Regions:
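Membrane-interface junctions of multi-pass transporters
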Residues: 2-48
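Iron-sulfur (Fe-S) cluster-binding segments and ferredoxin-like electron-carrier domains
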Residues: 2-9, 49-61, 116-122
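Local cysteine-cluster metal-coordination motifs and their immediate loop/turn environment
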Residues: 39-51, 105-116
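Recognition helices and adjacent regulatory flanks at domain boundaries
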Residues: 51-97, 105-108, 129
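Core AdoMet radical
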Residues: 94-105, 116-171, 183-200, 212-232, ...
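Low-complexity, serine/threonine/proline-enriched polar segments
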Residues: 133-177, 329-370
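Leucine-rich repeat
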Residues: 176-182, 207-213, 237-241
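Conserved C-terminal portion of the radical SAM core fold
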Residues: 221, 243-252, 267-425, 429
């Protein structure tokens, strides 16, 4: 299994230099005859993505790192040293530290986001926008014992039961101290939320790095929705000039009304305004990084075109959504998937996802029910938007709940007649609905 190491019992330096887990992986990757026992566990997401789509975060990271000859040489030097000594030691400024320790505070309600990553998602779920069928199998994400089984509503008082794995305040301070101890070896720090730019606590780390004269050597990366740039008295633009480089990796997988629907509470004009403001600084890059889901894939080519047409965006990248399974690209109706294939002729990984068969048990009617529940929740607010207005091509596949039993029974009879038996033995899936 995976190791029992966490921030409570293992420092960053111990994890990188002395950790048996990391050293096992290093040894396997340098052994051509290895069975890759540990690597298969640690890298299972990338292995799965490469098998399904021919592309993963691993392949993207290798491409980015190898394009920087100085950084790539550092990596090669460390590999050679480990081969000679069997030990990894921090000697060069080449480490990336990823910090997901500042909580789940977020200002958006993105339909595909796991609830443990967003305080707004938790609030909206607690007020009734929830689906056991879509999210119920992800036990770390469920508000345990809080859903009223008759109404399907999560009780507000129990919102704290959402499991998010964040560490407490004392450990946040400890993480700052640990980060400062290895600061001379840090090439980049990636801050992950929630929405990091509105998390006040992370600015304490930035202040410490500036005061220690380390900031000028370090790249700061944000996985951000880029809708807000201030948190209380903190303004990210006051900190930017002190760092070697600041990379704003904006979560953008739709343009205009599309992203405003999928990532509810987004203001597209504000995202662009903040992007333009970021580019006033010579040491800021803005990248778009999208999550390709069954909704976004219907318009994601617009994001690609936008980036190609607008030089304020440095690069675009994307990942294919894996969970919740119902939201995967391959679970769209076949008619829509076939129609989208020509739009992604230059993007074989997205085409590969579109060509995959539907996952067993994935039912687009459950997706419709969940999304329409969200539409109802936002009716009358400034974030009001409706699924079939934004994605009208989906409406023909929607079956009203009161009509589904008749459709289900009809399909069972057709199947029974086809195989020459008197009683249907095949149950309807979402294929029956599309």
């Amino acid at each position: 299994g995976l190791p029992n190491h966490n921030v409570n019992n293992t420092s960053l330096k111990e994890w990188m230099e002395d950790g048996e887990y990391m050293n096992n992986i290093r040894n396997e990757m340098l052994d051509a005859d290895s069975d890759f026992e540990f690597t298969k566990k640690a890298c299972k997401r990338c292995i799965a993505d490469e098998r399904r789509y021919g592309r993963s975060r691993r392949t993207a990271s290798i491409k980015i790192a190898s394009n920087d000859s100085t950084y790539w040489q550092m990596i090669e030097d460390e590999v050679k040293m480990f081969q000679m000594t069997g030990q990894f030691q921090m000697e060069q400024r080449m480490i990336e530290v990823q910090l997901k320790v500042y909580g789940d505070e977020c200002n958006l309600d993105c339909f595909m986001c796991m609830h443990d990553n967003s305080s707004i998602r938790q609030k909206v779920a607690s007020e009734g926008v929830w689906s056991d069928e879509v999210f119920g199998s992800y036990s770390w994400n469920v508000p345990v014992d809080t859903i009223d089984k008759q109404t399907g509503v999560v009780k507000k008082a129990n919102m704290k039961n959402f499991k998010n794995g964040n560490i407490d305040g004392n450990n946040v301070e400890d993480m700052i101290e640990q980060t400062m101890k290895i600061a001379p070896y840090i090439r980049s720090i990636k801050i992950i939320g929630g929405e990091p730019l509105i998390m006040k606590k992370h600015y304490e780390l930035l202040k410490r790095l500036i005061a220690a004269d380390q900031a000028q050597h370090i790249i700061i990366k944000y996985q951000t929705n880029l809708t807000e740039t201030k948190a209380g008295n903190h303004n990210i633009f006051d900190y930017i000039p002190h760092f070697k480089l600041v990379c704003m990796v904006a979560s953008v997988d739709g343009v205009g009304k599309t992203i405003e629907y999928m990532r509810r509470r987004t203001d597209w004009d504000k995202v662009i305004k903040n992007t333009e403001y970021c580019r006033r600084y010579d040491n800021v890059n803005v990248d778009f990084n999208g999550l390709v889901s069954l909704l976004s894939v219907m318009r994601f080519y617009e994001v690609i075109d936008y980036c190609l047409d607008n030089p304020i965006i440095d690069q675009i990248n994307w990942a294919l959504l894996e969970t919740p399974i119902n939201f995967r690209v391959n679970n769209l109706p076949e008619k829509i998937k076939k129609g989208l294939l020509p739009k992604y002729e230059l993007w074989p990984d997205i085409q590969a996802a579109l060509k995959l068969p539907q996952d067993p048990g994935a039912d687009i009617q459950e997706v419709f029910d969940y999304l329409l529940k969200g539409d109802e929740y936002y009716t009358g607010t400034r974030w009001e938007s409706h699924l079939f207005d934004i994605f009208p091509e989906l409406e023909e596949f929607y079956i009203k709940p009161e009509d589904r039993d008749r459709k289900h029974q009809k399909n069972k009879k057709v199947v029974a007649a086809h195989i020459g038996i008197n009683k249907a033995t095949t149950f309807a899936t979402s294929d029956d609905y599309v």
